[in-house]
């Protein structure tokens, strides 16, 4: 009989969001007439930008002609999209990232997991706590951690707590760590990091020859001009950081699928014989072997994000969701809740009242008023006592959900 990858057996019983879906389904089956408002998973709700729809429609028409048909595209992404990304997302901000350093993919979730393919298993790893579960689970699946402990953490991982006491900014590790996961604007807390604080992480990585895996999936929601959109705005970051970006949240591509990862050609790692190895060729080879590229039609849609009309329409989407976040934060604060985030990110991070646990508060909101959020403990041990609400929903649902919560 075939042997299984036993690392999967170390995973906690259920991934956070399927567990939420399971509880919601059970409640719905017992309460057929329940009107449930879901502010849990970070999935967008508004239609795609018109510019993207038109671009994809045109591309689809091209595919229906002999001259315009496209088969397999370059695994790294079409050059015209990579050049637009380089120009608008990086060069415009003073970041010298070339189009060749940009790899188009079908999602940051995939890339942040797949990047481990080119990194050795003996690297020490640090994650914030709470944290996007994929960072931890992908390391568990690939044998980079020890067994799980009773408190839900894993042996072999360094956990960096983020909470009210440190303004949701992690402290630098006390010892040398090889791989550092950072996400700003942060999921789940909605916290941000300024250039001075981010520079401390870059300096740490340079000093310790560490690699920062920087998730900037929510950078488009930044409202404060003093908050960096990319880690490459920090001097030296091209020598120590990989950045993940996505069109999912800013352009509503969660169901379309397009993202990109930046692998600077400066980045190096070590072989077992202490030979310096460039990371860019390794990732290029990995993608060429395991990935067939994003479809031509989708990449044309992503390209339209950078058109004049596309930029206006994307800004409209971002403004809409951020107004939702503002409404949620103001109403909850006025009702006496301690609320964080929501200013430069589409997530609201609530301190759970009455010393309830995160999951107890989840069940309380679901059963009392039919509102679904995400228990903070699902993001890690330090998330216990907190609760995440997402601004990704219709205005009417957001207003309705807030009225239900504050009138319990």
Swiss-Prot record:
Residues that hold pyridoxal 5'-phosphate according to the record: 72, 108-109, 132, 187, 218, 246-248, 257, 292
Modified residues (N6-(pyridoxal phosphate)lysine): 249
Residue stretches spanning the membrane: none
Record's catalysed reaction(s): (2S,6S)-2,6-diaminopimelate + 2-oxoglutarate = (S)-2,3,4,5-tetrahydrodipicolinate + L-glutamate + H2O + H(+)
Requisite cofactors: pyridoxal 5'-phosphate
Chain positions recorded as substrate binding sites: 15, 42, 109, 132, 187, 292, 388
SUPFAM superfamilies xrefs: PLP-dependent transferases
Domain of life the protein comes from: Bacteria
Catalytic EC class: transferase
Gene Ontology molecular function, alphabetical: L,L-diaminopimelate aminotransferase activity; pyridoxal phosphate binding
Pathway the protein acts in: Amino-acid biosynthesis; L-lysine biosynthesis via DAP pathway; LL-2,6-diaminopimelate from (S)-tetrahydrodipicolinate (aminotransferase route): step 1/1
GO BP annotations listed: lysine biosynthetic process via diaminopimelate, diaminopimelate-aminotransferase pathway
HAMAP family: DapL_aminotrans_1
NCBIfam families with a match to the protein in the record: DAPAT_plant
Subunit details: Homodimer.
Family named by the database record: Belongs to the class-I pyridoxal-phosphate-dependent aminotransferase family. LL-diaminopimelate aminotransferase subfamily.
Protein known as: LL-diaminopimelate aminotransferase
Organism of this sequence: Prochlorococcus marinus (strain MIT 9301)
Gene name for this UniProt entry: dapL
């Amino acid at each position: 009989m075939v042997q299984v990858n036993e690392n999967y057996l170390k995973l906690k019983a259920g991934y956070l969001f399927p567990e939420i879906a399971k509880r919601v389904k059970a409640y719905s089956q017992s309460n057929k007439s329940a009107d449930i408002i879901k502010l849990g998973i970070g999935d967008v709700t508004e239609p795609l930008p018109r510019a993207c729809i038109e671009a994809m429609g045109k591309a689809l028409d091209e595919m229906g002609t002999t001259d315009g048909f496209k088969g397999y595209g370059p695994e790294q992404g079409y050059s015209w999209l990579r050049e637009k990304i380089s120009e608008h997302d990086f060069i415009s901000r003073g970041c010298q990232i070339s189009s060749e350093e940009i790899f188009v993919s079908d999602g940051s979730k995939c890339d942040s997991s797949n990047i481990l393919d080119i990194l050795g298993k003996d690297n020490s790893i640090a994650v914030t706590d709470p944290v996007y579960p994929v960072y931890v689970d992908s390391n568990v699946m690939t044998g980079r951690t020890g067994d799980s402990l009773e408190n839900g953490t894993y042996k072999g991982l360094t956990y960096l707590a983020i909470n009210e006491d440190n303004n949701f900014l992690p402290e630098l590790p006390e010892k040398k760590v090889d791989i550092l996961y950072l996400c700003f604007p942060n999921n789940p807390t909605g916290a941000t990091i300024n250039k001075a604080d981010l520079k401390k992480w870059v300096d740490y990585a340079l000093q310790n020859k560490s690699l920062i895996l920087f998730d900037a999936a929510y950078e488009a929601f930044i409202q404060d001009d003093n908050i960096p959109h990319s880690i490459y705005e920090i001097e030296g970051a091209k020598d120590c950081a990989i950045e993940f970006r996505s069109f999912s949240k800013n352009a509503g591509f969660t169901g379309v699928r397009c993202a990109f990862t930046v692998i600077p050609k400066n980045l190096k790692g070590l072989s077992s014989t202490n030979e310096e190895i460039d990371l860019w060729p390794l990732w290029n080879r990995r993608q060429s072997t395991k990935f067939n590229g994003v479809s031509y039609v989708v990449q044309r849609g992503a390209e339209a994000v950078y058109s004049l009309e596309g930029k206006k329409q994307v800004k409209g989407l971002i403004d809409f969701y951020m107004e939702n976040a503002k409404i949620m934060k103001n109403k909850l604060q006025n009702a006496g809740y301690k609320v964080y985030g929501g200013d430069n990110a589409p997530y609201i991070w609530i301190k759970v009242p009455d010393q309830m646990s995160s999951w107890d508060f989840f069940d309380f909101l679901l059963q009392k008023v039919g509102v679904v959020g995400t228990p903070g403990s699902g993001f890690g041990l330090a998330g216990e006592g907190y609760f995440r609400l997402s601004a990704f929903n219709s205005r009417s649902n957001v207003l309705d959900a807030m009225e239900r919560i504050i009138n319990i």
